[in-house]
Every structure is written in C-alpha cells, then in structure tokens.
C-alpha cells in the first residue's frame, strides 16, 4: 500500500538531514498516515481509509459523507 493520504493526496517528500557540521544526507519526510474506520450512516457500514491527521481534520469539518462522495467522484474505490 502506498504512503499517500486518500483525502489530501499528501505523499512522502525528499529533503536533507543536517548534522551539527552542516553535512547533508538525503532523507524522506513521511506523512502522518493512519488507517482509520469511519461509520457511514446512510450506508450502515464502516469504510476504512488511509488518511493523514490533516485528512481527519478535513473529515471532521466537512463530514465523512461529503468526503466519500468526493473520493467516489475522483474514481477511488471506497
């Protein structure tokens, strides 16, 4: 499973570690992804999404039904 948030589309990005001597070594910044089950009231079932914590805040704000409708409009299987 890829490290991509299903709601926001956040992906890993690449940058540098910096030591005290300012030496640069490449590293990846990973999104804070969580597997989370959300209850869909109108379908009477749970859906499991891989979302970032920012995505969870968006779901809290908009509502899970609206977010799932947007995912389905994009063609994602939910």
Curated annotation (Swiss-Prot):
Region annotation (Disordered) maps to 1-21
What InterPro entries does its record include?
Ribosomal_bL28 (IPR026569), Ribosomal_bL28/bL31-like_sf (IPR034704), Ribosomal_bL28_bact-type (IPR001383), Ribosomal_bL28_sf (IPR037147)
Per UniProt, the keywords (alphabetical) are: Ribonucleoprotein, Ribosomal protein
Q: Name one GO biological process term.
A: translation
What domain of life does the UniProt record list for this protein's source? Bacteria
Any GO molecular function: structural constituent of ribosome
Q: Which GO terms describe its cellular component?
A: cytosolic large ribosomal subunit
Q: Which HAMAP family does this chain map to?
A: Ribosomal_bL28
* UniProt similarity note: Belongs to the bacterial ribosomal protein bL28 family.
UniProt-recorded name of the protein:
Large ribosomal subunit protein bL28
